[in-house]
């Protein structure tokens, strides 16, 4: 099957979910159902199947299918976990933003024209603004959303202008190295801005303050990742082939490498010194994005497979980290690290989840994600910088270690009174006597509008009458445990992706799409 059904489900589900925002329960049900449908539609995508649309072509790929499968699957778990953990205060715009972002990413990964693909990723990025402005907008939220819009607009404009410029016939300018150097630099800067890489991280820090922690992967990871994949393919097809004419672009490459190195090293240090968990998640994404920026600096077709492997590992691991942060905040009522002393002793499930996230994001030699990151660093840099960067990949142990050190300390006031992970059974409800009077007819549709009347009308259903109350009570008593288990599933998925599961190495090694963009 082509990718068209997925696009229809994603964009249609996003519209339906956002239109139903006035009815939170209906919006949540529609969003969850649409994500399930998107998951099924993504699984049915046939790699290599082309479809002519509006004078262009969209084509499915194994990597695009895996990208969308993981996006819809992790998104579904995010929605369920946030709804269970936060109740009525959950970000109701999240399902719509997720679906719109995934639809835009699917379109960007399927079209063959680079400029169209970039435009799709920009449209997907705008969906994140919806999450930032969830609920009645405050002046601070509006200011942050304006910063976010500005970053998306500037980054998108840089990449669109660069790809469109190189795509046109250049004539005599085709012999000028500056033409290709400026276009390459504009694309790299655009990707860096979308990720919030250093030194473009200030807008990302403001977004981390205002947006719900559960929405950070949508804002800072999934959308920018689609743009990065398109950019790496464009560099592979439009810049690398003209290097014999344009030269090796040493100045431009050096500038891109500086951004990548700064993000990879300083991002980890910034995450280590932050006291707010949202900022820890945000800067951890910035650090991982440094590897993506280095992939753009490599100017080598060999970077294609490892960069795409690393990108998917980054996405799933950071999605799990954001979900872990949300679960901690919901359970202990704070997201400040110094106030979370003893959290790990209170919740072994969340401890196991954080350990799995650390394994997925740091790894060890032989793990697919670890080797992919090492390959990107090796292709982009030379000694002695290469050796320093290979050592710096272990810097995340600083902030993971700090979280565990705090977690196994003495209980703080926030964690001392929090519920643990032990399952709890609700007390037996008091038996309710059946109301006197005539028994409702089971053949009347009005009977089935009320659970009490339905169970009264059918004799064998009468023992099930307390079931809704018991289920609701059990959910309330074990809400924290259920959310922790959902986060643990996400964390385990991130380890599977980092280990090369789900067919990731083969999908990432697919040839780059033939994106037009080389000047004649």
Residues of each region from the PLM?
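Alpha-helical transmembrane segments of multi-pass membrane proteins predominantly involved
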Residues: 1-520
């Amino acid at each position: 099957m082509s990718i068209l059904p997925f696009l229809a489900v994603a964009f249609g589900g996003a519209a339906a979910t956002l239109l139903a925002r006035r009815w939170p329960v209906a919006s949540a049900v529609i969003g969850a159902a649409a994500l399930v449908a998107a998951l099924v539609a993504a699984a049915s995508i046939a790699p290599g199947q082309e479809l002519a649309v509006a004078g262009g072509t969209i084509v499915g790929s194994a990597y695009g299918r895996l990208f969308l499968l993981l996006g819809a699957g992790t998104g579904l778990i995010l929605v369920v976990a946030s709804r269970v953990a936060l109740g009525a205060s959950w970000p109701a715009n999240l399902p719509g933003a997720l679906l719109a972002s995934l639809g835009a990413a699917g379109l960007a990964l399927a079209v063959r024209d680079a400029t169209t693909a970039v435009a799709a990723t920009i449209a997907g990025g705008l969906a994140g603004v919806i999450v930032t402005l969830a609920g009645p907008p405050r002046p601070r939220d509006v200011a942050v959303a304006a910063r976010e819009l500005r970053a998306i607009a500037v980054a998108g404009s840089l990449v669109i202008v660069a790809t469109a410029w190189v795509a046109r016939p250049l004539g005599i300018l085709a012999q000028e190295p500056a033409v290709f150097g400026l276009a390459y630099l504009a694309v790299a800067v655009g990707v860096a801005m979308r990720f919030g890489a250093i030194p473009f991280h200030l807008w990302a820090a403001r977004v981390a303050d205002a947006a719900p922690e559960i929405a950070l992967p949508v804002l800072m990871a999934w959308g920018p990742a689609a743009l990065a994949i398109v950019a790496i393919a464009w560099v592979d097809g439009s810049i690398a082939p003209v290097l014999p004419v344009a030269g090796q672009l040493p100045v431009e490459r050096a500038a891109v490498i500086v951004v990548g190195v700064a993000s990879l090293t300083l991002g980890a240090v910034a995450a280590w010194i932050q006291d707010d968990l949202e900022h820890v998640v945000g800067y951890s994404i910035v650090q991982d994005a440094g590897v993506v920026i280095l992939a753009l600096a490599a100017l080598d077709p060999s970077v294609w497979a490892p960069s795409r492997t690393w990108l998917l590992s980054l996405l799933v691991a950071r999605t799990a980290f954001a979900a872990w942060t949300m679960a901690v905040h919901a359970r202990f009522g704070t997201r400040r690290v110094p106030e979370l002393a003893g959290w790990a002793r209170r919740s072994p499930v969340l401890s196991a989840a954080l350990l799995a996230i650390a394994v997925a994001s740091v790894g060890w030699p032989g793990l697919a994600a670890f080797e992919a990151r090492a390959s990107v660093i090796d292709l982009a840099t030379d000694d002695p910088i290469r050796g320093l960067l290979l050592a710096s990949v272990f810097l995340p142990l600083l902030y993971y270690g700090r979280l565990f050190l705090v977690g196994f300390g003495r209980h703080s006031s926030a964690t001392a009174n929090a519920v643990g992970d032990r399952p709890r059974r609700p007390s037996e409800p008091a038996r309710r006597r059946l109301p006197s009077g005539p028994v409702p007819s089971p053949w009347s549709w009005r009977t089935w509008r009320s659970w009490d009347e339905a169970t009264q009308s059918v004799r064998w259903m009468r023992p099930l009458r307390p079931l809704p109350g018991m289920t609701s009570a059990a959910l309330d008593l074990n809400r924290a445990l259920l959310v922790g288990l959902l986060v643990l599933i996400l964390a385990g998925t991130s380890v599977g992706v980092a280990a090369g599961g789900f067919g990731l190495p083969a999908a990432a090694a697919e040839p780059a799409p033939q994106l037009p963009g080389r000047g004649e």
